């Protein structure tokens, strides 16, 4: 597979072909418009190598330039501030000195063992992307084309992965005990738990478990939080009784979430919460949120040769102003 730039006027087009394109995996990522794009998948520390092909479309033409270069770029873009684009990685390879092209030409490039410290991400208010950028420098207008890559950050099994167990309630009205089997889940994991009713003196009509994603961008007073309900799991529909125990099984893989991302380059975070919601007969809603960590498990082949590890320290979740917390 190669990346095709499209025409730059009538003279030439640019192609980028990776050396291992026949064997390298492809991954998907959603754009701001909700479309799904496929790009080659890379991990931290892997080299990026290939060829840049300048292909002439009209024989006999010539292209004067002031140099040709390729860059490997890692970039964070905040959608509410397009001018505040931050590059956390920028590697440059000069492919050609100033001169003139009269026919098609290929240039080899290689970025060795490239540091890729963060996962590719496309959210509501922020985008983190990696791309190759080819520039043909010209006197008036440069010819520039970008080719996106996808990066996944991998983690090993956490050293400690305690269960979550908590007793909550409303005094003399409702007391429940909920338990989740872990506090940290990989993206193909299953959330297993149970809800146990210790005291029920209000009429509960409906109960569900939600997987909530919070995207936090900015710092201090300029902080923006975008909340999305990734998944809903109906625990029960009807009134529970004292002593009743209800099991929970929520398959994370069916909802394709991202990993938890903590203070990425001091620009944004992505956090996940399990939100237990109860609705009574008067349509009043009660909830209890508990933060969990989502992480991407290394494939077996990679896990054998590399010791990936990420550590996360959960912070206290913030209560919603819209619903009373139990």
Swiss-Prot record:
Reply yes or no: does the keyword Transport apply: yes
Q: Does the record carry Protein transport as a key word? A: yes
Q: Which domain of life is it from?
A: Eukaryota
Membrane protein topology class: Peripheral membrane protein
Mainly localized where? cytoplasm
Q: Which Pfam families match?
A: Vps26
Keyword set, alphabetical order: Cytoplasm, Endosome, Membrane, Protein transport, Transport
Q: What's one GO-annotated cellular component?
A: endosome membrane
Where does it live in the cell? Cytoplasm; Endosome membrane; Early endosome
Q: Which GO terms describe its biological process?
A: intracellular protein transport; retrograde transport, endosome to Golgi
Cystine residue pairs: none
Q: What's its job?
A: Acts as a component of the retromer cargo-selective complex (CSC). The CSC is believed to be the core functional component of retromer or respective retromer complex variants acting to prevent missorting of selected transmembrane cargo proteins into the lysosomal degradation pathway. Retromer mediates retrograde transport of cargo proteins from endosomes to the trans-Golgi network (TGN).
Complexes and interactors: Component of the heterotrimeric retromer cargo-selective complex (CSC) which is believed to associate with variable sorting nexins to form functionally distinct retromer complex variants.
Q: Which family does it belong to?
A: Belongs to the VPS26 family.
By what name is this protein known?
Vacuolar protein sorting-associated protein 26A-B
Q: Which gene encodes it?
A: vps26a-b
